[in-house]
């Protein structure tokens, strides 16, 4: 699958753009703040129904306008064209369509356009809270397992309802254990398969991740990702029962898969505490390349790969290795941003495969062709 054409209207700093892409490598060059990353974010939007960088859809509307629109024509491995479009107005909810047919649930679109983004913000995966690491593992699995995504959405819905019930108990100064157990049963129902699939995913993911870390880092360091969960020791039902008193007085569900975490290790040392800046950069890039490979093996066709400002992450030699790697036939369509035209041109001239370069300036996009 590849993105053939992308049209933007009032998306972030871009008033209007119409781009036709190479099936292999596409590069956006321009100064910082020109809008290169915004183009990658628009592509990401078409895959995940949301921005990679902002949490509120309306924040993506160009200043002074009242809507944005993104339209992408994707060519499938069967040589069929699928048009994905998103329109967000100030006054209405987001409209998301595939071939002019609007989705009833945005979750039905997830996995249709497999895609992996590598961004300087990925270091937050190491240094920030556990919610980002859960989002990572959930995002990878959801791209090839719609049942997992459905269970996860239902778990979060029931969790919110259980927390609301706990708050009502506290506010009304009464407690009904039987009523709470109804929510517990549903949490157990959804939590157990999610936990099991997270475990299975990491078991299969680790050898792929180690392979890419070796390539990116150029070292023989051993990396590991440890899945931390209270469900390792006790079933979800027992955890909820033992935490009932604490939950009652905190008005919050203190145990469950929503508290799970991933611990990142290099040679048995936590990357967050002891990893150098170079090790952290190599770690997150390798994680994302392994995500590409893992999803490719699972779904049978190549995800689109977005490389945002990779020179911020790696030194020039590592970047040259990375561009050469993603330029081979195993990888599919790739989008790259850089601030230096001469640098990216040199890298592209030293690999096989067709490519296209776009100049970006103040939200305006111009192709070499």
Report each predicted region and the residues it spans:
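Conserved NTPase motor "head" modules and their coupling/switch loops across ABC/AAA+ ATPases, GTPases
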Residues: 1-31, 174-304, 313, 317, ...
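Conserved P-loop NTP-binding catalytic core
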Residues: 11, 15-96, 155, 170, ...
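Hydrophobic "anchor" residues on beta-strands that sit immediately upstream
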Residues: 37, 95, 115, 304-305
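Conserved short hydrophobic beta-strand within the ABC ATPase nucleotide-binding domain
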Residues: 43, 357-358
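Nucleotide-state sensing region of NTPase/ATPase domains
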Residues: 48-132, 141-144, 148, 206, ...
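Structural recognition of the conserved hydrophobic beta-strand(s) that form the central parallel beta-sheet
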Residues: 72, 333-340
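An accessory alpha-helical subdomain
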Residues: 118, 124-217, 228
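Walker B catalytic acidic pair
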Residues: 308-310
């Amino acid at each position: 699958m590849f993105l053939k054409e992308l049209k933007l209207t009032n998306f972030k700093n871009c008033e209007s753009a119409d781009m036709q892409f190479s099936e292999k490598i596409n590069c956006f060059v321009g100064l910082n703040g020109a809008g290169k990353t915004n183009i990658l974010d628009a592509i990401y939007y078409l895959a995940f129904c949301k921005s990679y960088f902002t949490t509120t859809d309306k924040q993506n509307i160009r200043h002074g306008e009242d809507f944005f629109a993104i339209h992408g024509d994707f060519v499938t491995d069967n040589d069929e064209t699928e048009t994905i479009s998103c329109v967000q107005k100030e006054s209405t909810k987001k409209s998301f369509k595939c071939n002019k047919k609007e989705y009833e649930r945005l979750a039905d679109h997830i996995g249709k356009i497999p895609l992996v983004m590598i961004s300087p913000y990925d270091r937050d995966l190491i240094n920030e809270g556990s919610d980002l690491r859960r989002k990572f593992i959930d995002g990878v699995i959801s791209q090839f397992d719609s049942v997992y995504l459905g269970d996860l959405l239902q778990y979060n819905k029931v969790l919110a309802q259980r927390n609301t019930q706990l708050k009502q108990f506290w506010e009304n100064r009464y407690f009904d254990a039987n009523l709470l157990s109804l929510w517990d049963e549903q949490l157990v129902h959804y939590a157990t398969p999610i936990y099991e699939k997270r475990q299975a995913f990491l078991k299969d993911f680790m050898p792929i991740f180690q392979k890419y870390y070796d390539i990116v880092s150029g070292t023989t360091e051993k990396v590991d990702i440890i899945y931390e969960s209270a469900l390792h020791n006790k079933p979800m039902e027992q955890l909820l029962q033992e935490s009932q008193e604490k939950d009652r007085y905190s008005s919050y569900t203190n145990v469950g898969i929503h508290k799970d975490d991933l611990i990142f290790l290099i040679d048995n040392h936590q990357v967050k505490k002891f990893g150098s800046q170079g090790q952290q950069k190599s770690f997150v890039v390798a994680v994302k390349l392994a995500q590409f490979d893992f999803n490719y093996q699972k779904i049978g066709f190549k995800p689109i790969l977005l490389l945002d400002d990779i020179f911020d992450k790696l030194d020039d030699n590592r970047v040259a290795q990375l561009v050469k790697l993603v330029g081979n036939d195993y990888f599919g369509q790739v989008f790259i941003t850089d601030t230096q035209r001469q640098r990216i041109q040199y890298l592209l001239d030293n690999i096989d495969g067709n490519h296209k370069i776009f100049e970006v300036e103040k939200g305006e996009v111009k192709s070499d062709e």
